[in-house]
Curated annotation (Swiss-Prot):
EC number assigned by the record: 6.1.1.15
InterPro entries assigned to the protein according to its UniProt record, in alphabetical order: aa-tRNA-synt_IIb, aa-tRNA-synth_II, aa-tRNA-synth_II/BPL/LPL, Anticodon-bd, Anticodon-bd_dom_sf, Pro-tRNA-ligase_IIa, Pro-tRNA-synth_IIa_bac-type, Pro-tRNA-Synthase_IIa_type1
CDD domains: ProRS-INS, ProRS_anticodon_short, ProRS_core_prok
Main location: cytoplasm
SUPFAM superfamilies associated with the record: Class II aaRS ABD-related, Class II aaRS and biotin synthetases, YbaK/ProRS associated domain
Nucleotide-binding keyword on record: yes
Keywords in alphabetical order: Aminoacyl-tRNA synthetase, ATP-binding, Cytoplasm, Ligase, Nucleotide-binding, Protein biosynthesis
Cell compartment(s), UniProt: Cytoplasm
Protein name, UniProt field: Proline--tRNA ligase
Length: 570
């Protein structure tokens, strides 16, 4: 590609509305332009990167045995009504009607469409297992699109869906997809971690997320220092450590006027929050008459509730909803002063986090306004219904597999794989004839990669004060050739043209910067756009039989002979 025929839409200043580095650099490097909130036009520089990401994804998916399809982004609402997600999905699902008043949605995902395809095309167990994938546009009507293409409303995704006769077959494909994703992200040049994850609104059982490590990541990911254990913070297990000591203090009630938070109480009493418990009162599942019980959760004072874990408890309503003021008043409780003493006797279910369950002589609310209790002990002073893992893990917690301790880092989710089970196949009646001649509900898996998000996450992980530092596999160009004074020096231009043709013939993706611009402008553009290799050709170098080479991360350029240069590029 000749730069004189390419769109270099670079910006010298950072746009004010760009918060994260990937958004800033994608705008400055001329990769994208904003059309509307959460909607972006991809310019030629960005499309080249997108195409390279898609090519790697497509190669590895084909290698895995998956079959490529292409499904409409516009989907009949009736399919979503069949699955139950038309209402459940919420306002992120864009709903509309065509001119014939038929309801449609703009697809945020394609479980319904692929299941409809499968129920019409798959007839026998002999056709299974089978795995379909596509690379297609999605639309989610985010309430607050942010961070450029990191959280946009319209985006490109690779989504795959597999169909099986049983769980064992699904597990084989799931493991295959896990390995495939590891190959994809390795080839993309990303520092990533696969982690155990919650299935969320997609549903199903087993699930793994793939995170690119970056300080700007929105998610906390947890991994062991000495094993391959890894999970997102929603899923990471907090193990029980230690045993409860025998009581050494008598229970005492102390005045704590206007001290409602654990931090306030412990400061007021000059106590360690680790030696206290805090109460969270939530709503349970309604009974047959519609009555909603209140459930009391207790955690150690310095720990935070993991709402996803709480929602998975069979007695707690999902989504997690905290008890109302009216419910507290009916129970005779005051927010900020609730302790476990006497709650079981009142008929409440009391669930205690593992770490809180081993405390003795701790501080708790006294179930009376402006008062707390010290020297509280389980069994003697307060009963509980059960012990349950309720909290977020913290740095230094023991790893659940018994190897090492946990570390927490920030990550950007770029991939997610699920074992869906029969959630969608049952809802849409997707069956095949089994080997006994009877209808068999198929078992499903789904596997997604955010293609546009991969581009942004690669930048979040690879940049400096000059611009992007692309992994070679996805750089818009691998090599840039800059002929000095090309418009005045036929000798330089001729040498540049010859090297350009030779490198292209060897399979390199080369940019010949033949623009009539100052060298400083060209060098700044090439550093900003992240091209890995820069070759400068000048008359002095040609006379000496050398080329000036500089790698994107090199501090200084070096003069190389042609043979040395070609060896350097390999």
């Amino acid at each position: 590609m000749r730069a004189s025929r390419f769109l270099f839409a670079t910006l010298r200043e950072t746009p004010n509305d760009a918060e994260v580095i990937s958004h800033q650099l994608m705008l400055r490097a001329g990769m994208i332009r904003k059309l509307a909130s959460g909607l972006y036009t991809w310019l030629p520089m960005g499309v080249r990167v997108l195409n390279k990401v898609e090519a790697i994804v497509r190669e590895e998916m084909n290698r895995s045995g998956a079959l490529e399809v292409f499904m409409p982004v516009t989907q009949p609402a009736s399919l979503w009504e069949e699955s139950g997600r038309y209402v459940q999905y919420g306002p992120e699902l864009l709903r509309f009607k065509d001119r014939h008043d038929n309801p449609f949605v703009l697809g945020p995902t394609h479980e319904e469409v692929i299941t409809d395809l499968a129920r019409n095309e798959l007839k026998s167990y002999k056709q299974l297992p089978i795995n379909f994938y596509q690379i297609q546009t999605k639309f989610r009507d985010e309430i607050r699109p942010r961070f450029g293409v990191m959280r946009s409303r319209e985006f490109i995704m690779k989504d795959a869906y597999s169909f099986h006769v049983d769980q064992a077959s699904l597990q084989e494909t799931y493991d295959n997809m896990y390995d495939t994703y590891c190959r994809i992200f390795t080839r993309l040049g990303l520092d990533f971690r696969p982690v155990q994850a919650d299935t969320g609104s997609i549903g199903g059982s087993g699930s793994h997320e793939f995170h690119v490590l970056a300080d700007s990541g929105e998610d906390d990911i947890v991994f062991s220092t000495e094993s391959d254990y890894a999970a997102n913070v929603e899923k990471a297990e907090a193990v029980l450590v230690g045993e409860r000591a025998a009581p050494a203090q008598a229970l005492s009630i102390v005045d704590t006027p206007n001290q409602k938070t654990i931090a306030d109480v412990c400061t007021f009493l000059n106590a360690d929050p680790k030696q206290s418990v805090k109460a969270l009162l939530v709503q349970g599942n309604a009974d047959e008459k519609g009555n909603v019980p209140v459930i009391a959760l207790f955690l150690r004072g310095d720990h935070e509730l993991n709402e996803i874990k709480a929602e998975h408890h069979p007695l707690i309503a999902a989504p997690l909803t905290f008890a109302t003021e009216a419910q507290l008043q009916e129970l005779g409780l005051t927010a900020g002063y609730v302790g476990p003493q006497g709650l079981v006797e009142k008929g409440l279910t009391v669930i205690v986090d593992r770490a809180a369950s081993v405390l003795s002589d701790f501080i708790a609310g006294a179930n009376e306004a402006d008062k707390h209790a010290t020297g509280v002990n389980w069994e003697r002073d307060a009963k509980f219904s059960e012990i349950y893992d309720l909290r977020n893990v913290v740095d230094g917690d023991p790893s659940p597999d018994g190897q090492g301790v946990l570390q927490i880092k920030r990550g950007i989710e770029v991939g997610h794989i699920f074992q869906l089970g029969q959630k969608y196949s049952e809802a849409l009646n997707c069956t095949v004839l089994g080997d006994d001649g009877k209808p068999l509900v198929v078992t499903m898996g789904c596997y997604g990669i955010g293609v546009t998000r991969v581009v942004a996450s690669a930048i979040e992980q690879n940049y400096d004060d000059k611009g992007i530092i692309w992994p070679s596999a996805i750089a818009p160009f691998e090599i840039a050739i800059v002929p000095m004074n090309a418009h005045k020096s036929p000798k330089t231009l001729e040498a540049a043209e010859a090297l350009y043709a030779e490198l292209q013939a060897q399979g390199y993706d080369v940019l010949l910067d033949d623009r009539n611009e100052r060298p400083g402008v060209k060098f700044s553009d090439l550093e900003l756009t992240g091209i890995p290799h820069r070759i400068v050709i000048g008359e002095k170098g040609l006379d000496a039989g050398t080329f000036e080479y500089k790698g994107r991360t090199d501090a200084e350029s070096v003069n190389l002979t042609k043979d040395e240069l070609l060896a350097k590029l390999k």
